[in-house]
Amino acid sequence: MQSWRQQGSIWQLRPRQPQGLIEFIGGSYLAATPQVSYRRILEDLCDAGLAIHAWAYVPGFDHQSQAKEAWMAFRQSRRQLEDRSGVLPPPLRLGHSLGCKLHLLAPDGGRGSHGLVALSFNNFQADRSIPLLGELAPRLGVETEFSPSPQETLRLITRHYIQERNLVVRFGRDELDQSDDLLEALKKRGADNTEALQLPGDHLTPASAGLRRSLLGAWADDPKRVEVIRR
């Protein structure tokens, strides 16, 4: 397997003859270094013959703008890959937590993808995602919310997200998961082939074992949980 390379905001991992492409966006606190935070799951996908493009970013309040930024970065990297390896099938978009939301807000409405795998969809309000903000904002007399807001995000998904092929994955002990809200928004569309899958684990299950060891100790190396990560 080839080593990770960074091109702008995209971390790339490519087999010698890629059979397809994964475009990945991670979640808050993990997204700045996806090649580390999600190393295991992404390298396993590369071992299966898929090129990996992972967007590195620091989450902000304007999620609509960041969704466009990610989409444009992926498009540029995909063109460069196809110049080298030939035309590939449409990419599969893979997101974790906030990364799911950013994929769902992409300017093309999912049109340019083969489908979306949404791991642990998360769409909380800003004061829930950033606890300190919830304490300081009232004292400062300001109102701060993500753009689009959680409610508007779900409306935009129903109205503008056109990709029919979606797999919504939730983990049994994930207290941050809001997949039910996403499924409801997707099912309201005229055409939908979305499927749901529940697996054992929690919100950090998609993250690499190395990061999870630092957060959770030996618990992260439970063989059953490692198998879930590989699945």
Residue spans of the language-model regions?
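Catalytic active-site module of serine/aspartate enzymes centered on a nucleophile-bearing elbow/loop
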Residues: 211-231
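The feature captures the conserved acid-bearing segment of alpha/beta-hydrolase catalytic domains
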Residues: 14-16, 115, 125-197
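Short acidic, S/G/P-rich loop/turn micro-motifs used as interaction or catalytic elements
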Residues: 28-31, 59-60, 99-100, 123-126, ...
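Short hydrophobic segments within beta-strands
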Residues: 24-25, 94, 119, 169
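Serine-dependent carboxylesterase/thioesterase catalytic core
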Residues: 70-159
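Short low-complexity, flexible loop/linker segments enriched in glycine and/or proline
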Residues: 62, 66-71
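Short, surface-exposed "cap/lid" segments of acyl-processing enzymes
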Residues: 2-59
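Catalytic histidine neighborhood in serine/cysteine hydrolases
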Residues: 189-215
